Curated annotation (Swiss-Prot):
Subcellular location: Cytoplasm; Cell membrane
GO CC term (a single one): cell-cell junction
Compositional bias per record (Basic and acidic residues), positions renumbered to this chain: 287-308
Residue numbers spanned by region Disordered: 271-418
Designated name of the protein: Hepatic and glial cell adhesion molecule
Processing after translation: N-glycosylated.
Residues modified as Phosphoserine: 280, 321, 352, 379
Length: 418
């Protein structure tokens, strides 16, 4: 009995200690490994600038870690691999001179390109540790948004029009997202306001007077946000618009008619002035040629008159019709009585302009020629009906004319010599 009681007591004690033994058996033993942390999981980079993929690791080992950065694609691309900060192997050409490693395992990428965008994975391991630490960081690379502008076909619209379209346009920028503002506030939900799938185009259907306002758009991407200048959209009532358009059309028509009416006469007057100028030039050229020819011929005619005074007298006698009708009175009218030894010669009406001008100074005549002049004055008058008398009168007239021409030539020579 005593033996049975002792066995039961030992068994009960063993059952009491079994939970503690079980706990000791299932408690895990701490394993050595690398723990990696990162302050950010998403980094936004700008083309041409730098991005820091920051990480930190902890380990019980004091050895240098082996760090490996990869860019996850369909086939992972190794960016860099190092022991501590010392690069192992050769870098890819597209990453050469653009990366830098730090002691905590962080990676700095310089001169970012659009191709650098993606998910980066870092692996850090130490030889004494059993497990390797891993961490992923997402990197986006974008181009900043340039200032947008709202494009419209016209800033004025007629009330109750079918549709009116506004387009938000910009030159540069990647991954843009668009937001429309009315009077600086986001558009309210309205069935008349229709947006394109990318929200770049705003269409207002059945325009109302309340749509008369300032409109602008905001374009943004992960690295920038830019707002356009507002555009004023003016909505006219149909009646007022008709008045404005009709008035403007009438004014434009009147202006065109006035311009056309003024332009045509001016064109004709220009042609007329041009023809008159040409005619005047031709007339002046003809006058110059005629004056030159007259200047060449006048001196010669004067010389011929001096050389042949009888011919000049005959020509003048033919031109005149009075000497035959009153031959007795004409010699007296041509000469006037004067002091003895002087005679006054009448001016010759048909004298050529080429002859020299007589001086006002008078010179005494030769006494040998005065009787001829006296005979001319003392000749008795004859009846005009007698043929013999007309012949003698014409002869005396010719003699007196020749005598006067000779006296004029002599006086001209005396004046020239003086």
């Amino acid at each position: 009995m005593k033996r049975e009681r002792g066995a039961l007591s030992r068994a009960s004690r063993a059952l009491r200690l079994s939970p503690f033994v079980y706990l000791l058996l299932i408690q895990p033993v701490p394993l050595e490994g690398v723990n990696i942390t990162s302050p950010v999981r998403l980094i936004h980079g700008t083309v041409g600038k730098s991005a820091l993929l920051s990480v930190q690791y902890s380990s019980t080992s004091s050895d240098k870690p082996v760090v490996k950065w990869q860019l996850k694609r369909d086939k992972p691309v190794t960016v860099v691999q190092s022991i501590g900060t010392e690069v192992i192997g050769t870098l890819r050409p597209d990453y050469r001179d653009r990366i830098r490693l730090f002691e905590n395992g962080s990676l700095l990428l310089s001169d970012l390109q659009l191709a650098d965008e993606g998910t980066y994975e870092v692996e850090i391991s130490i030889t004494d540790d059993t497990f390797t630490g891993e961490k992923t960081i997402n990197l986006t690379v974008d181009v900043p948004i340039s200032r947008p502008q709202v494009l419209v076909a016209s800033t004025t619209v007629l009330e109750l029009s079918e549709a009116f379209t506004l387009n938000c346009s910009h030159e540069n920028g990647t991954k843009p997202s668009y937001t429309w503002l009315k009077d600086g506030k986001p558009l309210l939900n309205d069935s008349r306001m229709l947006l394109s799938p990318d929200q770049k185009v705003l269409t207002i259907t059945r325009v109302l007077m309340e749509d008369d306002d300032l409109y602008s758009c905001v374009v943004e991407n992960p690295i920038s946000q830019v707002r356009s200048l507002p555009v004023k959209i003016t909505v006219y009532r149909r009646s007022s618009l008709y008045i404005i358009l009709s008035t403007g059309g009438i004014f434009l028509l009147v202006t065109l008619v006035t311009v056309c009416a003024c332009w045509k006469p001016s064109k004709k007057s220009r042609k007329k002035r041009k023809l008159e100028k040409q005619n005047s030039l031709e007339y002046m050229d003809q006058n110059d040629d005629r004056l030159k020819s007259e200047a060449d011929t006048l001196p010669r005619s004067g010389e011929q008159e001096r050389k042949n005074p009888m011919a000049l007298y005959i020509l003048k006698d033919k031109d005149s019709s009075e000497p035959d009708e009153n031959p007795a009175t004409e010699p007296r009218s041509t000469t006037e009585p004067g002091p003895p030894g002087y005679s006054v010669s009448p001016p010759v009406p048909g004298r050529s302009p080429g002859l020299p001008i007589r001086s006002a100074r008078r010179y005494p005549r030769s006494p040998a020629r005065s009787p001829a002049t006296g005979r001319t004055h003392t000749s008795p008058p004859r009846a005009p009906s007698s043929p013999g008398r007309s012949r003698s009168s014409s002869r005396s007239l010719r003699t007196a004319g020749v005598q006067r021409i000779r006296e004029q030539d002599e006086s001209g020579q005396v004046e020239i010599s003086a």
